[in-house]
Amino acid sequence: MKNLKNIVYSAIVLIIFVGITSCSTNKIKEITENSVQKKNVNVVLADLDWESVKAHNDLASYLIEKGYGYRTSKISGRSNPLRESLKSGSIDIVMEYWVIDKKTYENDINNDFFEELSINFNDYTQGAYIPRYMVEGDKKRGIRATAQGLTELKDLLKYKDVFLKEGEQKPKIISLAKTFALEGQESWKKKLENYNITSEFKMIEPENGEELKKSAIQAYENGEPWIGYYWSPSSMISKYDFIRLKEAPYDKEIYETTGMCENPNYNITIVASPQLKNNAPEVYALLKNYKTSSEITNKLLSISQQSGHISEGNMKKFLRENEGLWKNWVTKEAYENIIKTIK
């Protein structure tokens, strides 16, 4: 009888052990399969031609890779072809989609070309900028004010000779880079034409954002006159002292006809390909929560390299110092994974 009890007891223990082992094996198998599946998914971000989008790409990539185990990559290029790639699904994410043409944007969303996940930020400025020393001078650098009183774009023609360099027939005004969104380029040209600026100034279109930045910085460091399109947040405006020429307050009718007023504050959104939700659901959820501001973007830019990208060491420091910003964007498990990497 005693032997029978021992046999029954041993059988029960064996059944429990096999059950536990089977469950554990299934769980390990599930975790392994999920891990392998994630490693096979490459999340592609559009690395557009301005610094702030590169900085946001680096922040998002770090959270995606370290938090969830997905691979990421970036594709560089111009705004418009990259956005077409987003529609086709060869690009997964655009971290800064400037909603300039709202009708086309909404039409694309309604036709399932891509999906808006979040508004990244919308508290930015853009327009015609000049160095502050042109208006106020700079005693430390021995620069006298050459355009004292120039504070509004409508008055630019009164000061056109200040911008004229020796040997040139017309002064120059620097436009948006050729790689920027076509809607923005067209809006800028319309504005300048109706202010009669294009008849008195030669418009220069930089090949890319880096050339635009280089033009402004070179003039500033030499203490020379400069006028051109720029925006904030940007590393150039945060580092060098430029002022934006004022315009009349934004008016929808004026803006759409002549453009002779402030630009509207477009939403700068995060958009994703239709495939992202199924291919990388955790990434989709993360970006639905992702929201920053011009101030936060300038913080990112302050630690970026000249290219706009951020080193891993600086990114870890940013994440440590701004934990309250990103903690609620990610799941608890992803948060714990990320924390381990930044200590």
Predicted regions, residues:
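A conserved helix-loop-strand patch within extracytoplasmic ligand-binding domains
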Residues: 114-174
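A bilobed periplasmic-binding-protein/Venus flytrap-type ligand-binding module shared by bacterial periplasmic
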Residues: 126-144, 177, 265-279, 302-303
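C-terminal motif of bacterial Sec signal peptides marking the signal peptidase cleavage site
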Residues: 18-22
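Periplasmic-binding protein-like
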Residues: 118-128, 209-211, 236-286
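Short, well-ordered beta-strand elements
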Residues: 37-52, 70-75, 170-174, 287
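Ligand-binding pocket segment of bilobal, Venus flytrap-like solute-binding proteins
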Residues: 85, 91-98, 174-251, 343
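An extracytoplasmic/periplasmic, membrane-proximal ligand-sensing/linker region
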Residues: 41, 52, 181-199, 210-221, ...
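Short, polar/charged alpha-helical segment
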Residues: 51-70, 189-192
